[in-house]
């Protein structure tokens, strides 16, 4: 089976073609980073309009790169939610229109299921069951995964997501958008031990996260200290260490609770080098293994949507002709495959 996948949930327009026998055939992506940089964050209306401009050329490019015609496509998958509703509707309209005109089945995919399954695009894939740490600008959650669609959310952020905390703290430090990667780059120049940031909610039972207080602590520290480059780097490192330690502590707790030996990390923050190293070291000590997608599949992309959609289309799941974008959509409400 061969599926065209479309991703437009936020500020990346992604289109890909995935074949269940040959793997990923093409992967095209347009990022709106430059468009939103002057505003310090994503402007929903501008994001939607830019998706409209880019989506048709990217669909054509993805098909050409895969050496496909419409006759070679067996189904269409598109991100139905969660995300910015205007942006979602661009991809949903395109996906539904293509499926209808080609007389192919279509399926709306949960954006976070796409991230969760992104490591399946690699050669070394995790076996079920596994624990998934999904960390992005909009979500931070721990999920027990028994199979595709068999999800139990064990914990999630009660306020800011980890990626949001990275971006907001970076903005407080005067770093350009997108701030998370720039803060990590600055932290690489830092010296450990100069500052100690709290590890939120690690002294309490449970697996939920909270990062808003950490952001406030960072703001107060930034305001109280000098603005020289080394001090800024030290603060950035202390912040990054606090986020990574918090995520690692919660992962260890969840692994003990579930008894799982495999850990998946996915979402934009999963590209963070310090987080990957910390979790890899932890899993080695526990006799387990950590899995994550390559860097280009940590952020939003059409490949993960094509893969996730293919699994559901193969199981006979399809959507009706209605065009829907779901801004909020609990992951654990999805049907199993």
Swiss-Prot record:
The lineage of its organism: Bacteria, Pseudomonadati, Pseudomonadota, Gammaproteobacteria, Alteromonadales. Disulfide bonds: none annotated. GO terms for biological process: tRNA threonylcarbamoyladenosine modification. Gene3D superfamilies: 3.30.420.40. Belongs to the KAE1 / TsaD family. GO terms for molecular function: iron ion binding; N(6)-L-threonylcarbamoyladenine synthase activity. CDD domains: ASKHA_NBD_TsaD_bac. Fe cation binds at residues 111, 115, 300. This is tRNA N6-adenosine threonylcarbamoyltransferase. Pfam families: TsaD (PF00814). Required for the formation of a threonylcarbamoyl group on adenosine at position 37 (t(6)A37) in tRNAs that read codons beginning with adenine. Is involved in the transfer of the threonylcarbamoyl moiety of threonylcarbamoyl-AMP (TC-AMP) to the N6 group of A37, together with TsaE and TsaB. TsaD likely plays a direct catalytic role in this reaction. PANTHER family: TRNA N6-ADENOSINE THREONYLCARBAMOYLTRANSFERASE, TRNA N6-ADENOSINE THREONYLCARBAMOYLTRANSFERASE, MITOCHONDRIAL. It is found in: Cytoplasm. It catalyses: L-threonylcarbamoyladenylate + adenosine(37) in tRNA = N(6)-L-threonylcarbamoyladenosine(37) in tRNA + AMP + H(+).
